[in-house]
Amino acid sequence: MANPELLEEQREETRLIIEELLEDGSDPEALYTIEHHFSADDFDTLEKLAVEVFKLGYEVTDPEELELEEGGETVICCDALSECALNAELIDAQVEQLMNMAEKFNVEYDGWGTYFEDPDGEGEDEDDEGMDEDDDGVRH
């Protein structure tokens, strides 16, 4: 199970991200692409995690190398993507699920991010917006 202190830090970070997006005028009714970030020291370790995360229903990006600013060390990174409403409880459930998975595979969970959604955006399908009331955030 993920470290309770780290989970609490992530919960606080989630609320801060949501608050800042909404204060900046991001659309509260939009579906957001949530990018959960992972890193590992080697490709094989990250690949094992990526396969399991994909089986849970997340889209997983191709791994890429990233040189860290401090020390010049290179890590392998990927993201797990989901679409959901900007709802703290849904995102908390995903974060906990993915932090537990990362711990299982000895991979770093590096938080999540998303993008500003313009409430006046054109070309959006209204049927895709909003929160699915049956969505508990956990992917199966």
Curated annotation (Swiss-Prot):
Annotated compartments: Cytoplasm
InterPro entries, A to Z: RraB, RraB-like_sf, RraB_dom
Pfam families, per the entry: RraB
Keywords, alphabetical: Cytoplasm
GO CC annotations on file: cytoplasm
Region named Disordered: 113-140
Signal peptide start and end residues: none
GO MF, one annotated term: endoribonuclease inhibitor activity
Ranges of biased composition (kind: Acidic residues): 117-140
Self-association and partners: Interacts with the C-terminal region of Rne.
Stated family: Belongs to the RraB family.
NCBIfam families: PRK11191.1 (NF008393)
Function: Globally modulates RNA abundance by binding to RNase E (Rne) and regulating its endonucleolytic activity. Can modulate Rne action in a substrate-dependent manner by altering the composition of the degradosome.
Protein name: Regulator of ribonuclease activity B
Organism: Cronobacter turicensis (strain DSM 18703 / CCUG 55852 / LMG 23827 / z3032)
